Amino acid sequence: MFPKTLTDSKYKAFVDGEIKEISLQDYIGKYVVLAFYPLDFTFVCPTEINRFSDLKGAFLRRNAVVLLISCDSVYTHKAWASIPREQNGVLGTAWPMVWDAKRELCNQFGLYDEENGHPMRSTVILAKDLSVRHISSNYHAIGRSVDEIIRLIDAITFNDENGDICPAEWRSENKDN
């Protein structure tokens, strides 16, 4: 299930109020969370995106970045990012919102839901060399735990640095989220 190599490309993304092109290669040397979500302007997705934004500092302290990915256009991302949180928007989102226009990213991991026509609510964590270290998917109506993703980054980092295993419920001694 884990691809040995990733096909990389340039992707349009809404980043810091602008439309830019990004590539996974831009993030070599960092842990990368690929947070696939079904659609903009939905109800579960903004709760996740806003939580990722709220915990940006925790990710940065771990040398990690988050890419928020759907097949909605970068222009739809931009429109959604102008709507306040109280109205189910993601105003002030802290991470790039990536347009997987050709479904290249989600198809590499088998995360495109053909029946419903959008990516599954899924998380992929890449190591600093962009190797795949974690893949998980949630039922579309169930949001993911951003705190658990941070725990997984801690575990992956611990394994990378020490070569040691991390049993169930393992937690880093570093308690800062």
From Swiss-Prot:
Give the function comment from the record: Thiol-specific peroxidase that catalyzes the reduction of hydrogen peroxide and organic hydroperoxides to water and alcohols, respectively. Plays a role in cell protection against oxidative stress by detoxifying peroxides and as sensor of hydrogen peroxide-mediated signaling events.
Protein origin, superkingdom = Eukaryota
Natural source organism = Encephalitozoon cuniculi (strain GB-M1)
Q: Which InterPro entries match?
A: AhpC/TSA, Peroxiredoxin, Peroxiredoxin_AhpC-typ, Thioredoxin-like_sf, Thioredoxin_domain
The entry's active site is: 45
**Name assigned to this protein:** Putative thioredoxin peroxidase
Q: What is the E.C. number?
A: 1.11.1.24
In the record, biological process GO terms are: cell redox homeostasis; cellular response to stress; hydrogen peroxide catabolic process; response to oxidative stress
